[in-house]
Protein backbone atom coordinates (compact mmCIF):
# COMPACT_ATOMS: atom_id res chain seq x y z
CA UNK A 1 0.00 0.00 0.00
CA UNK A 2 2.85 2.41 0.82
CA UNK A 3 4.58 1.75 -2.49
CA UNK A 4 1.29 2.24 -4.32
CA UNK A 5 0.86 5.63 -2.65
CA UNK A 6 4.36 6.69 -3.67
CA UNK A 7 3.82 5.36 -7.20
CA UNK A 8 0.67 7.48 -7.32
CA UNK A 9 2.64 10.61 -6.45
CA UNK A 10 2.62 10.83 -2.65
CA UNK A 11 5.50 13.05 -1.55
CA UNK A 12 5.60 11.44 1.90
CA UNK A 13 3.88 8.82 4.04
CA UNK A 14 2.37 8.75 7.50
CA UNK A 15 2.94 5.27 8.92
CA UNK A 16 1.40 3.95 12.14
CA UNK A 17 3.18 1.31 14.15
CA UNK A 18 6.76 0.18 14.55
CA UNK A 19 6.40 -3.04 12.54
CA UNK A 20 4.69 -1.21 9.68
CA UNK A 21 7.42 1.42 9.70
CA UNK A 22 10.18 -1.21 9.66
CA UNK A 23 8.51 -2.94 6.73
CA UNK A 24 8.01 0.24 4.68
CA UNK A 25 11.24 2.16 5.33
CA UNK A 26 13.49 0.05 3.06
CA UNK A 27 10.95 0.20 0.23
CA UNK A 28 10.49 3.96 -0.21
CA UNK A 29 12.70 7.02 -0.46
CA UNK A 30 10.10 9.62 0.54
CA UNK A 31 9.98 11.15 4.03
CA UNK A 32 8.02 9.12 6.55
CA UNK A 33 6.00 10.57 9.40
CA UNK A 34 5.95 7.91 12.09
CA UNK A 35 3.35 7.53 14.81
CA UNK A 36 2.35 4.94 17.37
CA UNK A 37 -1.33 4.76 18.30
CA UNK A 38 -2.13 3.49 21.76
CA UNK A 39 -5.53 3.04 23.36
CA UNK A 40 -5.72 3.50 27.13
CA UNK A 41 -8.45 3.94 29.70
CA UNK A 42 -6.22 6.51 31.46
CA UNK A 43 -6.16 9.10 28.66
CA UNK A 44 -7.91 10.03 25.43
CA UNK A 45 -4.49 10.76 23.89
CA UNK A 46 -3.63 8.07 21.32
CA UNK A 47 -0.83 9.41 19.12
CA UNK A 48 2.78 8.86 20.23
CA UNK A 49 2.12 9.00 23.96
CA UNK A 50 5.57 8.14 25.31
CA UNK A 51 9.28 8.81 24.93
CA UNK A 52 9.78 5.09 24.28
CA UNK A 53 7.42 5.41 21.29
CA UNK A 54 9.62 8.21 19.96
CA UNK A 55 12.82 6.18 20.35
CA UNK A 56 11.28 3.17 18.62
CA UNK A 57 10.01 5.32 15.75
CA UNK A 58 13.32 7.04 15.11
CA UNK A 59 15.26 3.78 15.40
CA UNK A 60 12.88 2.26 12.84
CA UNK A 61 13.44 4.99 10.25
CA UNK A 62 10.91 7.76 10.83
CA UNK A 63 12.17 11.07 9.46
CA UNK A 64 9.38 12.96 11.20
CA UNK A 65 7.62 11.97 14.42
CA UNK A 66 4.10 13.23 15.02
CA UNK A 67 2.66 13.48 18.51
CA UNK A 68 -0.55 14.69 20.14
CA UNK A 69 0.12 18.34 20.98
CA UNK A 70 -3.17 18.96 22.76
CA UNK A 71 -3.22 19.92 26.41
CA UNK A 72 -4.68 16.59 27.53
CA UNK A 73 -3.10 14.26 30.11
CA UNK A 74 -0.91 11.43 28.88
CA UNK A 75 1.78 8.98 30.01
CA UNK A 76 4.70 11.33 29.33
CA UNK A 77 4.18 15.13 29.20
CA UNK A 78 4.00 16.53 25.67
CA UNK A 79 7.08 18.67 26.40
CA UNK A 80 9.08 15.52 27.17
CA UNK A 81 7.86 13.85 24.00
CA UNK A 82 8.87 16.86 21.91
CA UNK A 83 12.29 16.98 23.59
CA UNK A 84 12.74 13.27 22.83
CA UNK A 85 11.83 13.77 19.16
CA UNK A 86 14.39 16.54 18.79
CA UNK A 87 17.05 14.69 20.81
CA UNK A 88 16.63 11.67 18.53
CA UNK A 89 17.32 13.84 15.47
CA UNK A 90 13.84 13.70 13.96
CA UNK A 91 11.64 16.53 12.75
CA UNK A 92 8.71 17.17 15.08
CA UNK A 93 5.12 17.35 13.88
CA UNK A 94 2.43 18.54 16.29
CA UNK A 95 -0.98 16.97 15.81
CA UNK A 96 -3.19 19.84 16.98
CA UNK A 97 -6.88 20.48 17.57
CA UNK A 98 -6.82 24.26 18.06
CA UNK A 99 -4.81 27.36 17.27
CA UNK A 100 -3.66 27.43 20.92
CA UNK A 101 -2.18 23.93 20.53
CA UNK A 102 -0.34 25.10 17.42
CA UNK A 103 0.97 28.30 18.99
CA UNK A 104 2.37 26.43 22.00
CA UNK A 105 3.96 23.75 19.81
CA UNK A 106 5.45 26.25 17.37
CA UNK A 107 6.93 28.31 20.21
CA UNK A 108 8.46 25.11 21.62
CA UNK A 109 10.27 24.34 18.37
CA UNK A 110 7.91 22.15 16.35
CA UNK A 111 8.57 22.34 12.60
CA UNK A 112 5.24 21.02 11.26
CA UNK A 113 1.78 21.94 12.53
CA UNK A 114 -1.05 19.55 11.64
CA UNK A 115 -4.79 20.07 11.94
CA UNK A 116 -4.98 16.34 12.64
CA UNK A 117 -7.05 16.44 15.82
CA UNK A 118 -9.56 19.15 14.92
CA UNK A 119 -12.95 17.56 15.40
CA UNK A 120 -11.56 14.72 17.48
CA UNK A 121 -11.25 16.32 20.93
CA UNK A 122 -13.97 17.29 23.38
CA UNK A 123 -13.28 20.97 22.68
CA UNK A 124 -13.53 20.59 18.90
CA UNK A 125 -16.06 17.83 18.23
CA UNK A 126 -17.92 18.55 15.04
CA UNK A 127 -20.32 16.99 12.61
CA UNK A 128 -18.40 18.64 9.78
CA UNK A 129 -17.50 16.31 6.98
CA UNK A 130 -14.58 18.15 5.44
CA UNK A 131 -11.22 19.34 6.73
CA UNK A 132 -11.04 22.30 9.10
CA UNK A 133 -10.02 24.90 6.53
CA UNK A 134 -10.45 27.76 8.97
CA UNK A 135 -7.89 26.15 11.27
CA UNK A 136 -5.54 25.74 8.30
CA UNK A 137 -5.89 29.50 7.66
CA UNK A 138 -5.16 30.24 11.31
CA UNK A 139 -2.08 28.00 11.34
CA UNK A 140 -0.80 29.78 8.23
CA UNK A 141 -0.49 33.00 10.28
CA UNK A 142 2.16 31.31 12.46
CA UNK A 143 4.68 31.16 9.59
CA UNK A 144 5.22 27.43 10.08
CA UNK A 145 4.92 24.44 7.75
CA UNK A 146 1.20 23.57 7.79
CA UNK A 147 -0.16 20.07 7.22
CA UNK A 148 -3.89 19.83 6.52
CA UNK A 149 -5.00 16.55 8.00
CA UNK A 150 -8.32 15.16 9.10
CA UNK A 151 -11.41 14.50 6.97
CA UNK A 152 -9.66 15.08 3.63
CA UNK A 153 -11.77 12.32 2.15
CA UNK A 154 -12.20 13.32 -1.50
CA UNK A 155 -9.69 14.53 -4.09
CA UNK A 156 -11.57 17.85 -4.44
CA UNK A 157 -10.86 18.75 -0.80
CA UNK A 158 -7.06 18.63 -1.19
CA UNK A 159 -6.80 21.74 -3.41
CA UNK A 160 -9.19 23.54 -1.05
CA UNK A 161 -6.81 22.81 1.83
CA UNK A 162 -3.84 24.05 -0.20
CA UNK A 163 -5.74 27.23 -1.12
CA UNK A 164 -6.49 27.78 2.57
CA UNK A 165 -2.75 27.83 3.29
CA UNK A 166 -1.63 24.24 3.75
CA UNK A 167 1.86 23.37 2.56
CA UNK A 168 0.91 19.72 2.37
CA UNK A 169 -2.13 17.47 2.78
CA UNK A 170 -2.39 14.12 4.54
CA UNK A 171 -5.04 11.75 3.23
CA UNK A 172 -5.66 8.97 5.71
CA UNK A 173 -8.85 6.96 6.07
CA UNK A 174 -10.00 7.63 2.50
CA UNK A 175 -7.01 5.61 1.29
CA UNK A 176 -6.27 3.22 4.13
CA UNK A 177 -9.64 2.23 5.56
CA UNK A 178 -11.16 0.36 2.66
CA UNK A 179 -14.14 -0.72 4.76
CA UNK A 180 -15.22 2.93 5.10
CA UNK A 181 -14.89 3.64 1.39
CA UNK A 182 -16.72 0.44 0.49
CA UNK A 183 -19.53 1.32 2.89
CA UNK A 184 -19.79 4.81 1.35
CA UNK A 185 -20.19 3.32 -2.14
CA UNK A 186 -22.76 0.78 -0.90
CA UNK A 187 -24.74 3.49 0.90
CA UNK A 188 -24.87 5.65 -2.24
CA UNK A 189 -25.95 2.71 -4.41
CA UNK A 190 -28.62 1.58 -1.95
CA UNK A 191 -29.90 5.15 -1.64
CA UNK A 192 -30.41 5.38 -5.40
CA UNK A 193 -32.11 2.00 -5.63
CA UNK A 194 -34.72 2.76 -2.97
What is each PLM-predicted segment?
Residues 1, 44-57, 97-109, 143, ...:
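Catalytic cores of alpha/beta
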Residues 5, 24, 105, 113, ...:
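Conserved, mostly hydrophobic/aromatic
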Residues 2-14, 59-61:
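Catalytic domains of carbohydrate-active enzymes, especially glycoside hydrolases
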Residues 13, 32-36, 65-67, 92-95, ...:
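Hydrophobic faces of well-ordered beta-strands that scaffold small-molecule active sites
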Residues 14-33, 44-51, 69-86, 98-104, ...:
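Active-site-adjacent beta->alpha loops and helix N-cap segments on the catalytic face
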Residues 9-10, 62, 110, 166:
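A structural motif
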Residues 34, 87-90, 162-175:
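Short, electropositive alpha-helical surface patch
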Amino acid sequence: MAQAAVNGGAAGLRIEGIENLRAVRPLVDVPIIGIVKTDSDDTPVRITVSKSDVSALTESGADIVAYDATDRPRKDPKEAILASILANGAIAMADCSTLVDARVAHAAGVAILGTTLSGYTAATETDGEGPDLELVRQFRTLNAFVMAEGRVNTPSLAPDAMAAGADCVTVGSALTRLELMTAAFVKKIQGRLQ
